[in-house]
Regions:
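TRNA-recognition modules of translation machinery and tRNA-sensing kinases, especially anticodon-binding
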Residues: 1-303
Length: 303
């Protein structure tokens, strides 16, 4: 509460009247008291607008003559296409768990305040791996991918005190995550002590596959059991398809857990360029000292 009062310039004795608290989150009460609050970065009250919803997905109409019935949304991440096709991958390739599906592609987010270009843009290149594993082994696989992805950046030349691996606190975790670690880099244009995120490794559990199934697996009978709400309607809006996996060796059927390394391609490229940039006293003034694994020219002989 003290932090909220400080940020919004509210006296502590008025905090209970101005704020509402729910599961560790602070919300303004929707009344006239908000107009007397000084917003962050403002010098006087009255700058806060009424709360309203924002759609963070880009809506478009498919077809030159399409109407609202032809509405579609640009994907905000590449991950969901992998989850939707999970069953197709298993059935067509006969792959066995644990296995992963990797993808590079464009994603689109209707950012409210796009800024800093590479770090907050409405269109960006995303690299993701969805690694499917048995629930009992998911924590070990999370640690594996967390450490392996960090080492990957080290092997490419990002090392020293400019690169770090930071685990999320409990109040930072996304709604689908049971554990997340961020690989961060101290870009030279950031203030001292600040880092920019390169990649996040998240333990997504079975959240995505269960959401797409529109139900939950009954461990006693194995078939998909549809969950309903108090009105008898489906509780989850999914496909209704069975996305469980059966281990042929044990006949164990389960919903796989997912470990997701997710990175911005342009962020990693920018970090490698910053790391390679080397001032020089010679006439060239500067040269790029790339790691040999990514150097376009491995060696040269000059007269």
């Amino acid at each position: 509460m003290a932090r909220a009062c400080e940020v919004f310039s509210v006296r502590k004795k008025y905090a209970d009247d101005v704020f509402q608290w729910q599961e560790g989150l602070v919300q303004f009460t929707p009344d006239d008291d908000v107009s007397s609050v000084v917003a962050p970065g403002a010098s006087e009250p009255g700058t806060l607008t009424e709360p309203r919803d924002f759609n963070l997905m880009f809506k478009t109409i498919v077809g030159a003559l399409g109407g609202e019935d032809d509405a579609a949304f640009l994907r905000p991440e590449t991950a969901q296409g992998i989850f939707v096709n999970f069953k197709n991958v298993v059935d067509s390739t006969r792959v066995k768990i644990p296995f992963g599906v990797a993808q590079v592609g464009k994603s689109f987010r209707n950012e409210i305040t796009p800024r800093n270009f590479t770090f907050r843009s409405r269109e960006f290149e995303q690299m993701e791996i969805e690694f499917f594993c048995h629930p009992d082994a998911s924590r070990e696989w999370y640690q594996y991918w967390r450490d392996r992805r960090f080492q990957w950046y080290v092997d490419l030349g990002l090392a020293g005190d400019r690169l770090r691996l930071r685990d999320h606190e409990a109040d930072e975790l996304s709604h689908y995550s049971t554990g997340t670690g961020d690989i961060e880099y101290a870009f030279p244009f950031l203030p001292p002590g600040e880092f920019g995120e390169l990649e996040g490794i998240a333990h997504r559990g079975d959240f995505d596959l269960r959401s797409h199934m529109e139900g939950k697996l009954d461990p006693n009978t194995n078939p998909l059991q549809l969950e309903v709400d108090g009105n008898g309607q489906p509780k989850w809006r999914g496909s209704g398809k069975d996305l469980t996996y059966r281990d042929e060796s044990t006949n164990d059927r389960f919903v796989p857990h997912v470990i997701e390394p997710s990175a911005g391609l342009s962020r990693g490229t920018l970090a490698l360029l910053c790391e390679a940039y080397t001032p020089d006293d010679r006439p060239s003034k500067v040269f790029m000292k790339f790691n040999p694994r990514i150097a376009p020219i491995k060696a040269a002989i000059f007269p």
